[in-house]
């Protein structure tokens, strides 16, 4: 959902210390259905903002993925992905649905940040 009558979409802020900056690897864009993010990065920059029951389910039930909402701040398109722990990383399954609309290359930098008002993960191509 793009905005609502109470809160605008939270824009990308360069100076936000909780931005999750991911440099895309060839694996992330070449026929991949997932994008991987390190657990330590998500612990520091994302988990603190999530609902505790969601987070407990994600961390304590390893074989049960959780659905997460990703919102493209530029196109205002929402995509639902599943997130699952994989060792010391988390994989976001369904990434290929975003790749179908975007023309990312290896080396592109994507910023992800939690939108507190809409309880979703926003993202933007920044470099």
From Swiss-Prot:
GO molecular-function terms, A-Z: DNA binding
Chief location of this protein within or outside the cell: nucleus
A GO CC term assigned to this protein in UniProt: nucleus
Subcellular location per the Swiss-Prot or TrEMBL entry: Nucleus
Domain of life according to the entry: Eukaryota
Swiss-Prot/TrEMBL keywords: DNA-binding, Nucleus, Transcription, Transcription regulation
Feature: DNA-binding region: 35-127
Entry keyword Membrane: no
Protein name listed in UniProt: Putative B3 domain-containing protein At4g12617
Organism (species): Arabidopsis thaliana (Mouse-ear cress)
